[in-house]
Amino acid sequence: MLVWQSILLFLVGCVLSKSPTNLYTPGYVQCPEGKLTRSSLDGINSNEKAYIDRRYANAKSELSRFLHNAKMVDFDVDGFLNSNPTIGLAFSGGGYRAMLAGAGELLALDSRATNPSVLSGILQSSSYIVGLSGGSWLVGSLASNDLIPVDQLLREDKLWDIQNSLVAYYGVNIVRNTAMWGNINLQVQTKQLAGFTVSITDVYGRALSHQLLTNFDNQGASFLWSDVTETTSFQNNEMPYPILAALGREPNTVLMNFNSTVFELTPYEVGSWDPSLRSFVDTKYIGTRLDDGAPVSKRCVNGFDNAGFFMGTSSSLFNIVLQQLNNMPIPPFLKELISKFTLDPVEKLNIDIAQYNPNPFHKSNNSDTKIAQSRTLYLADGGEDGQNVPLLPLIHRKVSAIFAFDQSADKNNWPDGSALIKTFERQFSSQGDGIAFPYVPDQNTFRNTNLTSKPTFFGCDAQNLTSLTENIYDVPVVIYLANRPFTYFSNISTFKLKYSDTERQGMISNGYDVASRLNGKLDNEWAACVGCAIIRREQERLGIEQTEQCKKCFENYCWDGTIYKGEPLGDNFSDEGLTTSAAYYNSNNVAGINDGGIALVKRDDLSN
């Protein structure tokens, strides 16, 4: 009986899978007509544009509902929405801290939540959702699983089992751990034997899938990132268009915010808007050998874009955790592959690189760049250049407003605005050609004037952006929400690799409180103020004056241009984010500080 059940499950998997092999190993299909690459100068991908147009019909009604519920005063919601304001959600890197805190923030935006917040409906109103590194685990796993609501995910308790690290996923069960790594060994080795280059990211991506793609047969071995377009939520235009961010990195080079090539991994295409590439390739056919975008034969590779591999690419900094396998009984092929990147002094510098061979952009129309000259495309963790909040994909799409959720570990594992600063600075480099990002202050100002302890809006007045661009109305209003403690000390180490269920829930609950401002308890106008930020750029474009309600909101939340020149005052995490004491947030009354959180430096202590 068990044999027939296994056969039936295999056949069902074949039907559901879009991979031609129903395995982790890619296969071959007939090539479509024409080139598989395109120039970024052509604008948004035609399939993406068609999806966003269909999506906006849904998003418009959801945004209308949100704005009505937000009690916008003296504002004609339905008349205004004919102007099509668009929203993008950006979730930062930061390991499981970023995934879990971001999950709570996303839950606060989701109208499907069991306990809706004052911001419920923002997710349904959004056109795009972007994640990098730990944020890619959030975006990638939810999109792959049909945009499952976070609270449903927790109730079902199948995904995001992170009670043990990836290295020993089954805890003390040595037999199951050995079987898991034996299976991963077989999958990666089979891919190599089929003629495809493999790297440590293949191993890491397959391990990561045990936590993020648990609902799929064989932990999503044959589930592709391009398969997201076949999910019910995508087919019904109910999902913000999902994007994962990574960076192009040549071996033995160091990435900076002014020289990196920011790659987008979307269900339709992969590539970059940056001058160092300005090309995209069809996601379905990555792995195909191309010459200036055209297949060199009639057979195209299909199945290379494994969803776990893509999430592993965006978070490849965590490849380093696999060095713990050197002392474990794993198959020789796997041991040799991992040892190459963890023990060899030269290769160890490149442990964070995912290899895409052949390079789809080889000999492309931008052939004078290093990327186009290389036979292998090397991609790395999306946050390695300091732009730890994936803003650029949304800037290129000229959205009206960006929610920037920052879980970075800049100072004592709290954000200090560095991610936004790096993106602001980039626009003045050659790689920043064609982008504009609103003014932001330095890190000292972010921390010491409370811009990380409560939400802050940037780019509030388009007329102040004229020195950055002529197209001032294409610059988004940025709604910045930094990780901070409310009900849990959420500044856990990026490299904390396992969380108990209590810790997991604590992180998610705190993220919910960060986004919702304790579900409106700290400001009963918070939802209205968010609404004011969403509509601001379109109001300016149309010449509509702000209401008195919105003017008051902007006085409370917009950065006013102040630059702090004094001595550091220490962290300030009072409820309001405005007082001079952190007395309410210490190990005696907030959970989590003994789970990896770092104690605060109190302002009142510094003044003594």
UniProtKB/Swiss-Prot annotation:
One of its GO terms (cellular component) is cytosol. InterPro entries: Acyl_Trfase/lysoPLipase (IPR016035), LysoPLipase_cat_dom (IPR002642). Disulfide bonds: none annotated. One of its GO terms (biological process) is glycerophospholipid catabolic process. It is found in: Secreted. Residues 30-564 form the PLA2c domain. This is Lysophospholipase 2. It comes from Candida albicans (Yeast).
